[in-house]
Structures are given as C-alpha cells and as structure tokens.
Amino acid sequence: VALADEAINIGLGPVNASYLDINKIIDVAKQTNAQSIHPGYGFLSENSNFAKAVELAGLTFIGPKSEAIALMGSKSVSKKKMLEAKVPCIPGYQGDDQSDNTLLKSAKKIGFPLMIKASAGGGGRGMRLVNQVDDLKDALKIARAEALNAFGSSELILEKAFINARHIEIQIISDAYGSHLYFGERDCSIQRRHQKVIEESPSPVMT
C-alpha cells in the first residue's frame, strides 16, 4: 500500500463489509479510472461471481475467465469434473449434502487421518486435519466458520490425508494474445498451518 500511487480505504471491521464487498471494490475501480482489477490472494481471488462482475463492469479481470473460475474455484465442482474425466483423485467426499450425519458417514468410509477443506478459496483457511472420528464434529464446526468468514461459503469437502506426501506445483502463465509460458516445478512441501512457507525450484526430489 505504501508503494501504491493511490490508496483507497474500502472499509473497516469484518471482511464481509470490505474485502468481500464486490460492489464496493468495483465502485472504487471506477472512481479511480482503473482499467483492470487484480484480485490478490485469498478472499475473492477464486470467486467466479467477482470475476463476472468485473467483466460486466467493462473492466479487465487479471486472471482466468469467470467460467474457468466457476469450474476450478470450487473444489467440489472441479473434483467432480476430474472424476468424470477419469483423472486419478484422492479418495474423499465432495457432495451437495453438507449435513454432519452425511459427512460423518463419508469420513468413516474414507478413513482417518483425513482433511477437511473449504470448497471455496484457499490459503490454508477452512482446513483441518482430523486424526480420529471423535474430533470430527468440532473440526467441522471450526472449518465451516473459517470458510464462511474468509470466502462467504461454508461448503466443505473431505479428503484422505497423506501425511508424508510432497506438494509439487507447475505454474502456467498466458496473455490475451495466445502466448503461453510454463515455469519449472516448485516444491511447496514446507508448510505452516497448511500454508506454504518456502518454495524450492527446482524441486530437490525431482531434479
């Protein structure tokens, strides 16, 4: 903010009245004659409704098209699509029924340890590692609250937890002129609270 040419206060208090207020962000963009909006990280960065609102306002959303975000911004929707395409996926539950009873039955079927994940957003919010069934109910309550506060949605998915797995990413960047570049793999396995702390490239276990 200190390095920005212009800074606008979009609100104080809960994020629902500031960083999650789509209309307010677009209004500020128009007031400052901005041509594009970069969503940043977390909050609305993976919200397809925000990307669509930016597009409809005649501004450029720096990121994927709203249709792509709608597909990939929801872990439950994207995982269903991958399973339909027969892409190998971690065993889990990504159904519409979000009742405690259904999630409990699904958790027992998946087995422990397992991860509770917010279907929307990322950044480690709305995630809980559950090692035994007795801890599941409280973990679901906490994860739902975190997800709702951070992303505006309390929808959750469950996945089998692989404790000693590596987190490897490959990033692709494209522009509006059909140019595409990819970066070498990054090892993001060193984490704190399910959030990357260090990214190593190239990965020491792959190169």
Residue ranges, per PLM feature:
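N-terminal beta-alpha lobe that positions the nucleotide/phosphoryl donor
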Residues: 1-207
